[in-house]
Amino acid sequence: MAAVDSDIEPLPRGGFRCCLCHITTANQPSLDAHLGGRKHRHLVELRATRKAQGLRSVFVSGFPRDVDSTQLSEYFQAFGPVASVVMDKDKGVFAIVEMGDLGAREAVLSQPQHSLGGRRLRVRPREQIEFQSPASRSPKRVAPDSHQLIKALAEAPDVEAQMVKLVGLRELSEAERQLRSLVVALMQEVFAEFFPGCVVHPFGSSINSFDVHGCDLDLFLDLGDLDEPQPAPKAPESPSLDSALASPLDPQALACTPASPPDSQPPASPQDSEALDFEAPSSSLAPRTPDSALASETLASPRSLPPASPLQEDQGDGDQGKAVELAEALKGEKAEGGAMLELVGSILRGCVPGVYRVQTVPSARCPVVKFCHRPSGLHGDISLSNRLALHNSRFLSLCSELDGRVRPLVYTLRCWAQGRGLSGSGPLLNNYALTLLVIYFLQTRDPPVLPTVSQLTQKAGEQVEVDGWDCSFPRDASRLEPSTNKEPLSSLLAQFFSCVSCWDLRGSLLSLREGQALSVAGGLPSNLSEGLRLGPMNLQDPFDLSHNVAANVTSRVAGRLQNCCRAAANYCRSLQYQRRSSRGRDWGLLPLLQPSSPSSILSATPIPLPPASFTQLTAVLAQVLREALGCHIEQGTKRLRSEGGGPGEPPQGGTSKRAKLDGQKKSCEEGPEEQQGCAGEHGEDGVEEMVIEVGESVQDWVMRSPGQLGELPLMTGKHLATREEGQSGTAALAKQGPRGPEAACEGSQAEAEKRVSLTVSWRCALWHRVWQGRRRARRRLQQQIKEGGGSGAGSGAEWLATEAQVTRELRGLSSTEQRPEAEPLLTFVASTSQADQSLTVTPLQDSQGLFPDLHHFLQVFLPQALRNLLK
């Protein structure tokens, strides 16, 4: 119990943090459930096992270099049973011997002198290191709030300077780039011994100009034609670069070591030679840029890396011979992918100094061999059939060379997406997809910032085809005309948020080759979409036209992306974004880059609703919230609202002003800025919101509206200021602008009706945790009804009555009792939109941190409730 107490840290407002698992729980029941869960119990057992192993182990050094683990085991067995022996594989200067019990360890330590092979051994107790739980596999969202970052960005004169400064804080230093070049050269030297003529190409973030501290090292091993006769492979000598990589970022070693082995083979073609996008390190190194708090991973030193297990350390002993045997077996015949991956893995384990944790992943979309390099602290992977990714990396590098605004914009948006929980693995956007989204956006500006891939192909000169796909584009950016678009970075960032918030991600295909959105409904051209898998978000690879790089993104993540972009676009219209604060407040990029809390991330996550007419949905939703869950729904008044807001939350301090609208129709002749629905202008446009009293139909309000739909003001979006009183129970009726900048203003009423979007919102208050223990209470009530001879909830009315009774039991109140006068436990705004048939829930007051639990309950309960009442 004492160990459990030391792992748990109480938090304000009744929460708890488990320091062992690095998670936070909202209340005591959630904590109890976590402590009894499999993850926590596994880590507790693992910690106890590691501690017991440490208490039974001794540290041994001073033995001859030719002594192996078997000889050490035989020697120490004279004092008692030996559980394992872990050797220092790289240097062979020490070993950790784990005895079978504490008595054997004490016998070893009580011996005054040990000797083996004529050498005196130094034996001492193993140092006890504090247990650290394995790194979480969830996407890391490191808060960009370090003192260095805040100071650097706050002191910048404007937003553009902040974005440029952000690049300098996140990108790799010159020393880090040279270190990666040395690792690539080391790999080239080793693999050339087994596969003469092969070339190791770096790709991905290491060469695409969007690198960050700690990014992985992606390598493509180009083996050429394996059908050609190959000389017999031999075990390579110790690479000459091993000494240079003995200690990470050693200036002397880096300065005196060539970037590529002198006997390495030249690239097979001029195109391949451009992949080695680095020069030999000079004799003087630029000072290393300090790691930023924005980095998703940090460059680890050998000391900070976790020790390898005995199994991992011992695996390398026979891998060198195994690699030679596999290479002999595969010589003269075309190897299958799995066997070749195993061969590459064996070479890494047995022949590359400092490499550990080698793992082959043949089931990936592109089979790879993952590895870690201990001296440099780098994580990487090697692929054998990913030549297309090499050209993708060169294309991204070309885009960054064509316009200096590309890198600051990509770095800023990657950091913003990371803080919002939009980028990562699983159903989230990966960095490659997010970068392509930015490039597509820049292609669609007027005038364009970047050319389309088709335009680049026409100017390529030489045609390059990879796996049947046309990968032709100029390699030299100086051969292309610069863009005539001179918009500042701050404006482009605001326009990006505004555009993405109104793009039809599901109904269109964003094509970088054509530089436009292709409608999915009308059918896509076969030459542009054959084999393409469509989904909630469709973003086409620039070369592999059958690959949707956002195919993994779910509808929930796509909806959250647009909601976050809408909130960010609202913030970019405020003075807080445009001007430096004279009061020392966060301004410009800082509010955008602050990581979202779990509640704000959930509030941007839409809850999908079953198909039904919007009028039915709103009526049934209000009924479920009020009767089934016991929410008190407050009524509001008619209001005029501006689009001001904050990045994910309403602004504090009144930085946005409300603008009154005259309701008159805007003319199409006002200029191109007004015609572009996602131009991102910093205007004072507003949205007129009309209150619908509880029980009043949205359709009735539309029928009684004094103006025609075509007379409503032309708007680009809407925003609900949730912290204002009296805005609940409202329906926002806004005529949205065209979907893209190329759309023209249509004056007909039919077109205006298509652009009308209805949004109904309720301000709800809860005094009791009606979601906690609900299933148990429902089963108990159903059992009572069954014992009394009643029937189950068959119709929608019976189901609603049952749920209302469950709520009353959970509240401990009678059906006639009024709500108490005390402050509510939780208040929130529930808002449903006709455009996407979904519900968003935004917390207003949540002093106890209960909103995540409520949102999780509503995700399951509300869709099922609506299906029961609408059937």
UniProtKB/Swiss-Prot annotation:
Q: Which GO terms describe its biological process?
A: co-transcriptional mRNA 3'-end processing, cleavage and polyadenylation pathway; RNA 3'-end processing; snRNA processing; U6 snRNA 3'-end processing
Q: Where does Mg(2+) bind?
A: D216, D218
In this chain, composition skew of type Pro residues spans 259-269
* Highest taxon, organism lineage: Eukaryota
Q: How is the cofactor bound?
A: Binds 1 divalent cation per subunit.
Q: Which reaction does it catalyse?
A: RNA(n) + UTP = RNA(n)-3'-uridine ribonucleotide + diphosphate; RNA(n) + ATP = RNA(n)-3'-adenine ribonucleotide + diphosphate
Give the residue ranges for region: KA1: 596-871
Q: Can you say where in the cell this protein is located?
A: Nucleus, Nucleolus; Nucleus speckle
Modification Phosphoserine occurs at: S748
Q: Binding of UTP: at which residues?
A: D216, D218, N392, R414, Y432, H547
Where is region (Disordered) located? 252-321, 636-684
* EC number of the protein: 2.7.7.19, 2.7.7.52
Segments forming domain PAP-associated: 489-547
Listed under GO cellular component are:
mRNA cleavage and polyadenylation specificity factor complex; nuclear speck; nucleolus
**TM annotation in the entry:** none
What does its PTM field state? Phosphorylated by CK1 in the proline-rich (Pro-rich) region.
InterPro entries listed in its UniProt record: MTPAP-like_central, NT_sf, Nucleotide-bd_a/b_plait_sf, PAP_assoc, RBD_domain_sf, RRM_dom, Star-PAP_RRM, Znf_C2H2_sf
Q: Does the keyword Magnesium apply?
A: yes
Any idea which positions bind ATP? Answer: S205, N392
**Primary location:** nucleus
What family does this belong to? Belongs to the DNA polymerase type-B-like family.
Free-text note regarding domains? The zinc-finger domain is required for terminal uridylyltransferase activity. Together with the RRM domain, binds the 5'-area of U6 snRNA.
Outline the subunit composition.
Associates with the cleavage and polyadenylation specificity factor (CPSF) complex. Interacts with CPSF1 and CPSF3; the interaction is direct. Interacts with PIP5K1A.
Designated name of the protein: Speckle targeted PIP5K1A-regulated poly(A) polymerase
Organism, as annotated: Bos taurus (Bovine)
Annotated gene: TUT1
